[in-house]
Amino acid sequence: MGKKVLLTGFDPFGGETVNPSWEAVKRLNGEEAEGVSIAAEQIPTVFHHSAAVLKKAIEKHKPDVVICAGQAGGRAHITPERIAINIDDARIPDNEDREPIDEPIAADGPAAYWSALPIKLIVKELRKNGIPASVSNSAGTFVCNHLFYQLMHRIDRTSANIRGGFIHIPFLPEQTIDKPEPSLSLETIVEGLRIAAVISALHEKDIRETGGSIS
């Protein structure tokens, strides 16, 4: 039986009219590639509500792998995240105008969780296909990191036979018309997430080689 991957993307936030994570993952919904089936769901950019929506999506699709994607304006690469940390520290309000400062995500949780995705292998395969990619060592402290941490905390506490992680993606070109930020085309992002989904489903173990960045 083939593997199933659940991809999630966020709704727009911070004054943007689109969110590239949702624009990309919704184009992969229902696809099959190399025996891997892909489903996609949208997550609200809301601290207190995002994990509940993800929980329902996991219960609905019963995936083998969950990859949450999010927008990281200012980054030039597709960046699989290495670690989720147990803190909310918002620089801007979320989409329900909540702005938690220095608040733990889970009072009974560990300081951090490692990604369970083969992040170095994903980077290698993306680069092999001409897609700029690098490992990120910080998912920030906004809703992206919050969801990443909640995903891994849920997997840990329920002993679910699921592997999960998070991937940040750059702005789309239309988002950078009025700001000097890097971007990637939607087609490139879609292909990058397709590759990441297949690699994550077919490979549980990562490789050990350079794939990160200085910061």
From Swiss-Prot:
A family per Pfam: Peptidase_C15
Keywords in alphabetical order: Cytoplasm, Hydrolase, Protease, Thiol protease
Cross-referenced InterPro entries: Peptidase_C15, Peptidase_C15-like, Peptidase_C15-like_sf, PGP-I_bact-type, PGPEP1_Cys_AS, PGPEP1_Glu_AS
Locations listed in the record: Cytoplasm
A GO cellular-component term linked to this record: cytosol
Origin superkingdom: Bacteria
Active site: 81, 144, 168
EC code(s) of this entry: 3.4.19.3
Principal cellular location given in the protein's record: cytoplasm
GO MF annotation, one: pyroglutamyl-peptidase activity
BP GO terms, sorted: proteolysis
Reactions catalysed according to its record: Release of an N-terminal pyroglutamyl group from a polypeptide, the second amino acid generally not being Pro
Alphabetical list of HAMAP family matching this protein: Pyrrolid_peptidase (MF_00417)
Record text on subunit structure and interactions: Homotetramer.
The family this protein is said to belong to: Belongs to the peptidase C15 family.
Chain's role: Removes 5-oxoproline from various penultimate amino acid residues except L-proline.
Matches recorded under PANTHER family: PROTEASE FAMILY C15 PYROGLUTAMYL-PEPTIDASE I-RELATED, PYROGLUTAMYL-PEPTIDASE I
Name by which UniProt lists this protein: Pyrrolidone-carboxylate peptidase
Organism: Bacillus licheniformis (strain ATCC 14580 / DSM 13 / JCM 2505 / CCUG 7422 / NBRC 12200 / NCIMB 9375 / NCTC 10341 / NRRL NRS-1264 / Gibson 46)
Gene: pcp
